[in-house]
């Protein structure tokens, strides 16, 4: 038995009641160092036999390595290295004009630094601390940059990732949040995609960091000329997202939704920046796509109902 929160549709209130374990569990707890997450981890370990709609997704480095194994995805993955020493960072900067240094398990744009190479010995850094406070842009010599990065990393595990040119003419960064979910037929389906524009001086586009959401097509129009070409880019992004979702589910285990953070350059090439297993839905409300928001809420329930009927049906 569990002491569950039960919704009363007549009173429109929630209350605690003792109930037997549910037939299906939809895990929406975000990965974070907290007592609640530790409780969830112990629960999943103890009751591993229960039916979960989704399994925890692994860290960013592991997901990158999994996707890299499939040749279909390689051209869509920014080159990424584990930040084991500052040599990893400078090796990337030898090949790309800018890179991002990000925590292996970070969310919400926290703890991300952008490094741009200005000359052989001079670099421009910008970032966002773990509390989401923006670090103003500053120029550092190579030796000082090394010290800064080692202090920034501390005892944590970080990645160094190829930077993609995602600045708009006004200097703000942008990307796209693509949500794919299982539908009522048990198939992966595109729920929606919204554009995100970062706050002034921010190196990330996250909404919690001061960014705002817009409709995908209007943001694409700022960099891609021609409606036909924009639709082609959108179809490519959707097809890639669906293929990645199916591949990760096949490799890792049960999943019912994924949000992919995508960068699209001026040539229309799509890059996968991150894959998020427990995404928020507010990006669709903010962008004005209320229908995508409605679908984002309903689809997991429709998939759960389909899965329940399928597992409860007597085998022939």
Please name every model-derived segment:
Residues 196-207, 276-288:
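Glycine-rich phosphate/pyrophosphate-binding beta-alpha loops
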Residues 116-121, 182-186, 265-268:
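Short acidic-glycine loop/turn motifs at beta-strand connectors
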Residues 54-161:
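Active-site nucleotide/adenylate-binding loops and adjacent lid/helix of ATP-dependent enzymes
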């Amino acid at each position: 038995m569990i002491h569950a929160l039960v919704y009363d549709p007549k009173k429109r209130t929630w209350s605690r009641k003792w109930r037997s374990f549910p037939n299906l569990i939809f895990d929406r707890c975000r990965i974070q160092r907290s007592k609640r997450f530790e409780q969830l981890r112990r629960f999943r370990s103890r009751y591993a036999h229960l039916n979960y709609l989704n399994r925890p997704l692994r860290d960013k480095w592991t997901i990158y390595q999994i996707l890299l194994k499939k040749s279909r995805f390689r051209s869509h993955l920014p080159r990424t290295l584990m930040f084991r020493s500052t040599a990893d960072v400078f090796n990337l900067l030898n090949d790309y004009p800018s890179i991002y240094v990000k925590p292996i398990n970070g969310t919400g744009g926290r703890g991300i630094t952008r490094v741009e190479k200005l000359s052989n010995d001079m670099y421009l850094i910008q970032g966002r601390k773990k509390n989401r406070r923006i670090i103003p842009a500053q120029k550092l010599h190579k030796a000082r940059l090394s010290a800064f990065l080692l202090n920034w990393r501390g005892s944590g595990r970080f990645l160094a990732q190829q930077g993609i040119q995602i600045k708009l003419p006004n200097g703000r960064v942008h990307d796209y949040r693509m949500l794919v979910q299982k539908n009522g037929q048990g198939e992966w389906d595109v729920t929606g995609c919204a554009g995100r524009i970062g706050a002034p001086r921010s190196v990330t586009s996250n909404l919690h960091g001061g960014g705002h959401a817009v409709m995908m097509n209007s943001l694409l129009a700022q960099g891609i000329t021609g409606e036909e070409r924009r639709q082609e880019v959108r179809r490519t992004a959707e097809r890639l997202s669906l293929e990645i979702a199916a591949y990760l589910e096949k490799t890792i285990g049960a999943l019912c939704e994924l949000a992919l953070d995508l960068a699209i350059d001026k040539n229309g090439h799509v890059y996968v920046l991150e894959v998020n297993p427990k995404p928020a839905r507010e990006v669709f409300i903010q962008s004005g796509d209320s229908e995508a928001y409605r679908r984002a809420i309903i689809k997991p329930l429709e998939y759960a109902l389909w899965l329940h009927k399928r597992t409860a049906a007597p085998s022939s």
